[in-house]
Amino acid sequence: MQANSRAYFLLIALVSFGLVGVALYLQFEKGYQPCPLCVMQRFAFIGIGIFSLLAAVAQNTRSLWQGLGMLSGIAGIAVAVYHVSLLLNPKASCGIDPLENWVNALPTAKALPQVFYADGLCTAPLPPVLGLSVPAWSLIWLFILTLTLAVGLIRREKNFR
């Protein structure tokens, strides 16, 4: 069971980090400039990945790391829902996003600007990827990963009863 649990969390981390890799590919190879909401969704995927790695190696505190991974996912889902709603209603945005200054002032934007610096507009029309916008794909994957962590936590709790 322990080997299965470790593989379970490692797979979640791999998918999370892989999706950040897809975002970087779209940024550097396809020219999709990340907006502040995109960067915040990257933080959510990275949070899920890091907490899943910690859950894989720390059996005694696994539920804690799993819960924190779920919180990262829930925060990312909230951001992605808002982002998708902005794309569906572009007139709701004023064009200048005050969130950009805040995101770009974070230490991560200064340490790794290639990954965490936001210079795109949240309502910029970008070509769809496999028929959906990037924020829609982000929402789908954040939901899947968060649900996967939640199901694992529920199963774990049932096994201890």
From Swiss-Prot:
Molecular function via GO: electron transfer activity; protein-disulfide reductase activity
UniProt keyword annotation of Disulfide bond present: yes
Similarity remark: Belongs to the DsbB family.
Transmembrane segments: 9-25, 44-58, 64-81, 137-155
Gene (name only): dsbB
Pfam families named among the record's database cross-references: DsbB (PF02600)
Name the UniProt record assigns to this protein: Disulfide bond formation protein B
GO process terms (BP): protein folding
